[in-house]
């Protein structure tokens, strides 16, 4: 049986009169790719902030080892592109020995050697996302949290991104927790899907998302159309 790395038990969070999440319970299993989906304002960011320890629950319990090392890739990375700095120099600032052990493990797979002399500002969206992922694994995390990583990426870059995620998980033995709104790619690439809209609407494994299933109907009620996206093992 797989070990759980995060467990939410009846967790609620209030900010004044607002309650972005209410009585939320779920488990993230070790070495799985778990994806949290939901509409804007569903409470996804609140969940991430609770996992990171930036917020405390108003009620309920979060079971997570605070010694757990987390690599976090925010929706907006916040790196200015005005400064003319190359990929190599940027990574050197974060890992002085350049291409530390983890980055070396994946550098050939993500073509870092090919782009390392390019300026950050000249990278495509897909190339920049690879650099961001390299940053997130420098400290050898147990858990990687990715907030809307597919945003602004074209279909080809999305496919390359997921190939990289699967490679990193296997090579470095990392658990992945992802926020996304793209149900089709989620179904194809996740071990577990959790649907949130202030509370847990449904959760399960991708092959359970079949036409007219309870899972599928719950997703459809939130605007996630599943009838074209049957997933078969």
UniProtKB/Swiss-Prot annotation:
Task: Tell me which SMART domains the record gives.
Answer: AAA
Q: Does the keyword Membrane apply?
A: yes
What's in the keyword line of the UniProt record? ATP-binding, Cell inner membrane, Cell membrane, Ion transport, Membrane, Nucleotide-binding, Translocase, Transport, Zinc, Zinc transport
Gene Ontology CC annotation, any one: plasma membrane
What does the entry give for GO biological process? response to zinc ion
Q: Which SUPFAM superfamilies match?
A: P-loop containing nucleoside triphosphate hydrolases (SSF52540)
Assembly behavior: The complex is composed of two ATP-binding proteins (ZnuC), two transmembrane proteins (ZnuB) and a solute-binding protein (ZnuA).
Q: Which family does it belong to?
A: Belongs to the ABC transporter superfamily. Zinc importer (TC 3.A.1.15.5) family.
Annotated protein name in UniProt: Zinc import ATP-binding protein ZnuC
Gene it is expressed from: znuC
